[in-house]
Amino acid sequence: MSSAPVRPSPSKEGSGKHGSPKKGPYQPSLLRALHGCSALAVLGCWLTGLVVYGRYDGRWGRLPLQLPGDWIDIHGSLGVVLLPFAVLLAVYACTLGRRRLQRPSNSLPLLALGLAIGSGKLMQEDWLRSGQLHHLAYHLHLLAWLLVGVAVAAHLWGVLRLGGWPLAQSMLNTTARSGDQPSDWLRQLRRRR
């Protein structure tokens, strides 16, 4: 018989060395804040874009019901909300998140978002109301809407493929480590230059 102490074997699920709980991946709080705000605004823009398309265009299909409201204005307002978050997320991605941009599943959503915002800024909201569906900016905006949907799906697939549910859940974590509080964000950006 061996006199070595018996250590409990770690369970296969959620535990690390010596049976202690395994900590999942940690994402910087600034990334989580910018990513979360941008993601919510993108989702709102994408869904309202679907409603606007169904009401005013519908060449390739319509929603089965017409929702009341001025959806062009709602869509445009959400785009205005999205703009500063998208710019800040792009700045973050090009500085602190530069290494992550090497993965196409991370860079393509930003490019699609840039096309969506840029083409949206070129549009006149009265075009759709008056049936003017021939403008290049509108066609680019439709293409961007499709690309955003595909790019976000590819981004989610890439996250799940790379780190599974723990990585996806780490983006929803609301706790911040010491040195990663909102008061530390400016210092983090300066240090990374």
Please place each PLM-identified region on the residue numbering:
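Membrane-embedded alpha-helical bundles that constitute the cytochrome b-like, heme-associated redox core
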Residues: M1-R193
